[in-house]
Amino acid sequence: MLSTTMPRSPTQQQPQPNSDASSTSASGSNPGAAIGNGDSAASRSSPKTLNSEPFSTLSPDQIKLTPEEGTEKSGLSTSDKAATGGAPGSGNNLPEGQTMLRQNSTSTINSCLVASPQNSSEHSNSSNVSATVGLTQMVDCDEQSKKNKCSVKDEEAEISSNKAKGQAAGGGCETGSTSSLTVKEEPTDVLGSLVNMKKEERENHSPTMSPVGFGSIGNAQDNSATPVKIERISNDSTTEKKGSSLTMNNDEMSMEGCNQLNPDFINESLNNPAISSILVSGVGPIPGIGVGAGTGNLLTANANGISSGSSNCLDYMQQQNHIFVFSTQLANKGAESVLSGQFQTIIAYHCTQPATKSFLEDFFMKNPLKINKLQRHNSVGMPWIGMGQVGLTPPNPVAKITQQQPHTKTVGLLKPQFNQHENSKRSTVSAPSNSFVDQSDPMGNETELMCWEGGSSNTSRSGQNSRNHVDSISTSSESQAIKILEAAGVDLGQVTKGSDPGLTTENNIVSLQGVKVPDENLTPQQRQHREEQLAKIKKMNQFLFPENENSVGANVSSQITKIPGDLMMGMSGGGGGSIINPTMRQLHMPGNAKSELLSATSSGLSEDVMHPGDVISDMGAVIGCNNNQKTSVQCGSGVGVVTGTTAAGVNVNMHCSSSGAPNGNMMGSSTDMLASFGNTSCNVIGTAPDMSKEVLNQDSRTHSHQGGVAQMEWSKIQHQFFEERLKGGKPRQVTGTVVPQQQTPSGSGGNSLNNQVRPLQGPPPPYHSIQRSASVPIATQSPNPSSPNNLSLPSPRTTAAVMGLPTNSPSMDGTGSLSGSVPQANTSTVQAGTTTVLSANKNCFQADTPSPSNQNRSRNTGSSSVLTHNLSSNPSTPLSHLSPKEFESFGQSSAGDNMKSRRPSPQGQRSPVNSLIEANKDVRFAASSPGFNPHPHMQSNSNSALNAYKMGSTNIQMERQASAQGGSVQFSRRSDNIPLNPNSGNRPPPNKMTQNFDPISSLAQMSQQLTSCVSSMGSPAGTGGMTMMGGPGPSDINIEHGIISGLDGSGIDTINQNNCHSMNVVMNSMGPRMLNPKMCVAGGPNGPPGFNPNSPNGGLRENSIGSGCGSANSSNFQGVVPPGARMMGRMPVNFGSNFNPNIQVKASTPNTIQYMPVRAQNANNNNNNGANNVRMPPSLEFLQRYANPQMGAVGNGSPICPPSASDGTPGMPGLMAGPGAGGMLMNSSGEQHQNKITNNPGASNGINFFQNCNQMSIVDEEGGLPGHDGSMNIGQPSMIRGMRPHAMRPNVMGARMPPVNRQIQFAQSSDGIDCVGDPSSFFTNASCNSAGPHMFGSAQQANQPKTQHIKNIPSGMCQNQSGLAVAQGQIQLHGQGHAQGQSLIGPTNNNLMSTAGSVSATNGVSGINFVGPSSTDLKYAQQYHSFQQQLYATNTRSQQQQHMHQQHQSNMITMPPNLSPNPTFFVNK
């Protein structure tokens, strides 16, 4: 029997004589504690005492688990995650990579469960606590279950039960295994709830502890089959009386603590803590989501819920707390009334209560914004809730939710979420058995169904156990949920029953049937109330889920049908799904491979789920993502999971994004991001699939060498993980993939996601945004803050969440790289595979780790749909999650050709490794990885998001770009416009950037101008995008996503690049800005993508890439958007291939490069303005022309765009190239654009690249991919940003090389912002980009002096990147610094070249050409040179040039002529 000791409530926490209660805080604190998956979090992690203050509500930090206490309970120690327990948000405390819920989440969650310790019995903070507990419950119980649960002393139990009310913790303590939760009341009034989880020795399910509050979640985890039951209910529980009664009380308490939910639970849950769990699920769901592969779904759902939870769910949860937080007395009364038979459900009871009724009824009406939010998330996010299930599930969930949601008023989302979560748990539990093993089990079925359509996806995995437990718990929980819904007036019979096959059994389920008290049994008042409620609910459903209203059932059913695999995939990404989110989560998984495995399937997921606190956001973001696409449910929390398909999309998730991402932190940190990300994700998702495919492809491309092997490895890993997971009792279809994620050292992890994604893969492609690639996603979806479209943008938080997801991307990093960084990444724990993903998270800048989330967010936000998601999600887990197929399909769609073409091995691409690893390889993200620390990052928000971004960023993004073609990815937020404002630097990187940016000032101005220009340029991003990228580089980073969107191939790449470093970095601080990246969106798939209306750039992809607008905006997230908006506005204007108009660079104003002047001055320091000020593109023309020659070569696929370019979709890719201005330009359809970009790149390059490290990479990727010189050329600017990615994508590298060069130029900015954070870091950035840097470095060589910076980068983020192996040279560069730089460049080139092989060479040459026009147009070259000098005023142009030259010559030798961005070079030329 596993006894999970939850951390005490803060007050409780104070060691108390009755340490038994060390778990005391189980309920309140628990959530946090449980948050970690059940690995020995308690003892290991838990022991890490979280400092907790006596707090009525358990704040994550408040919760503290005394090591002794933790260890006291064998279960606790067993459940690693639980240990983190109290530290959900604040907890960070997971010691061994334990995931902790993000504080946001936790806090939210905490409320409910925690119910203030002091008045735990009386005061329920909110249902959140339960959720938290649920998270806690997630704790894996494998071994734990074996251990005897520490039985709470009878007295304690009694006390606990008494106190339990106050806390929901007591309630759903049970997880997969029946566990009884004993809460004991401490003298301090601190509830100590000792959750004795006893693992029911079930044949299939591995004992998984749900977070305390989640009865089901635990089940959901590995063993779908092992629903947690309160001892009373538990079949095997030895908790027995104590536990049982205690549990029951707790349940009751929980119910009360959590309010109706709890009461409902009590009602139902007395028998089923599950409901309690569900309640917890609301918040916990995320955790719940984490709970098992099935949970993956759940995770997805939960994550989604949470994700949105972070933005939506979480916020909503908080709202729910308010909504559902009734006085304890009221809750008790409700529970009593239910128990006494007066009411069938607590909700029913509450519905009859005027105050409650009014509150619930009026809640949404009074909070239209909330409804909108709900709606927003619904469309994108609501499904989150469902999404948890899977993208698909969401529909049903949505329907359910719809049904529930209205009723949510009463129970509110919370309930639905809980239900979903519960169901998800169940689903998760069952999910493993996709078939809805529990179908026969009405309860299980119902639960799944009800909460999520996911029910069907429930599955067999848990199969029998799941069924049993699910029956008990599920039934209970589900019935409770149903009851709640029914009480809410939702006609579950109709919806639930109708929609889910399982639901049909619902009729057979007494509890379910009993949910609705017959009207005849109601008093007239009650009846009236019910009618009113039903009407309101109906209204709500119509309002929120118009499409799901009645068709939900059908939709869900149909989707469920397809969802299962998908769902599984998406959902858990298999376990991965969750993981995916986790991917980023993986990060937490990261905590331990095992965790991941567990996590993926069960505990790992749980753990992930836990992370969700952090990750939740990310996850949420990702989830949002998933949401978007049904299939993309990949997005589904899965986010990773879903990301599978959407992985990229979810990813997008991202992410990561991405859907993230991935991770929650974004959510947590930047909830808004999350939301927006989620939205974006959704969009992305559509794209994502393509993206993911693309990404994968690109990845493959990038890792073409790995292609075949990767594929094989991927398969092996996948199988291996899958098997392990199954063995682990965490069976999940996706699990395998998920696990692979973990396992896969490089991209495998990410890829594992892919596997999961695979199912999604099918739909995504169709969905993929190829069509919408630039225009739709970008235009529509672009998260341009200014534009409503920015679904992606919706909420930075969301984005963040998504990003978080994406964060995992970094995992992609590549095991090696990751590994190295992993430690820093924290992901390391995740495992190579996961870690890899996480590594990506590492991204360029670890320092930014904190920011990553934001970046992720950005990325997510950037969602850019595809890119971001893919990136996000892919980058994080999402990418990984994408199944190779997914990738293919994803990449394929749009970039598929490119990708495929570019990517040597489709399979390779597909192989998770490729995309994931590749991206990681691209590592520019790797650096992020360090930040990755899954949970930390998630928590910190920085890494995850970043990672997600990063993760496959380059590759993924690139792929995505190709695939999403940008459009969708476009969304990506130019996370960092910050570079724009050097000082804006949301974070150090920006500062660094700033540092760099003396020049940066210029750059910033330029960026803004460029942004403006870019917008203008925006023509395809042509220059604009690039410019954006460049200027906004930082933004761009976000934009990466955006880029992705527009770029699609290129854009994505760029985005990645951006994302990777800058973005991440930016993202971290700029996360919101990153959103801007929507502007990224700009970029659209093609040049127009640049226009990417959405993108802040507006069209601009350049913008997008450029971040440009974003850039300007970048500094403030909003800014980002605005730029997008402005960008968008101007974007069109810029569109013309010739948008050089304003951009003209005059020799007289080289500094401004006129394009800067044109737009710059306004935008100058104004990130927002910059974006805003349209300012016609300065004379980018010269850049254009300058770039044109190369452009010509790369014309089609902006070097950056390579994906596109390589595809021949120069425009799109151009966008990508956009990342660097050049790349973007390249992207522009016309050469002109490209040229502009090229020109721009030169000019804006620095800027673009500023943020772009990754972007560069992307560009590189693209450039490299296609091998476009142009690409490279453009890439150069792009490279600056994308360099790393390019480097990462050596295959593509060739083109990338130039981008690299560009990157280097850009690097400075980029680095500052992103990579190294060294202003000087151009190189750093480049370095980050690694291959790119030097390549770019040459170009950027002027910055070369910054080589040192590069060095810095290497240390921090670049290293990772290089780790990606993007270009080992890059790494070298990082490591070596100047000398290295060149060498790096060389290596970079080599890598690029080698990776790209011929591409490299070709690209390299072309890349060199990138500078191309330089020889052709000396005048231009000179102008450009001046411009650059001015741009990088800080460094002596000469110096920079020299360095650049040197590097170019030495590294760029391949691409020396054009490649060297060096103005001098140009001039010389």
Swiss-Prot record:
GO biological process: canonical Wnt signaling pathway; chitin-based larval cuticle pattern formation; imaginal disc-derived wing margin morphogenesis; leg disc pattern formation; positive regulation of transcription by RNA polymerase II; regulation of transcription by RNA polymerase II; segment polarity determination; sternite morphogenesis
Result, substituting residue 537 to K: In allele lgs-17P
Primary residence: nucleus
Subcellular location: Nucleus
Region (Disordered): 1-131, 161-187, 200-222, 422-442, 454-474, 728-830, 844-913, 961-991
Region (ARM-binding): 511-555
Sites bearing Phosphoserine, chain numbering: 9, 206, 210, 883, 905, 911
KW Nucleus (keyword) present: yes
Phosphothreonine PTM sites in chain numbering: 11, 208
Keyword field contains Phosphoprotein: yes
Biased composition (Low complexity): 17-34, 116-130, 731-745, 782-796
Cysteine pairs bridged by disulfides in the record: none
Outcome following mutation: residue 534 to F: In allele lgs-17E; segment polarity phenotype
Record key words, sorted: Developmental protein, Nucleus, Phosphoprotein, Segmentation polarity protein, Wnt signaling pathway
Polar residues bias (residue ranges): 1-16, 40-60, 90-113, 422-438, 455-474, 770-781, 806-830, 844-880, 904-913
Described purpose of this protein according to its UniProt entry: Involved in signal transduction through the Wnt pathway.
Subunit relationships: Binds to ARM and PYGO.
Family stated for the protein in its record: Belongs to the BCL9 family.
PANTHER family: PROTEIN BCL9 HOMOLOG, PYGOPUS
Protein name: Protein BCL9 homolog
Organism this protein belongs to: Drosophila melanogaster (Fruit fly)
Gene: lgs
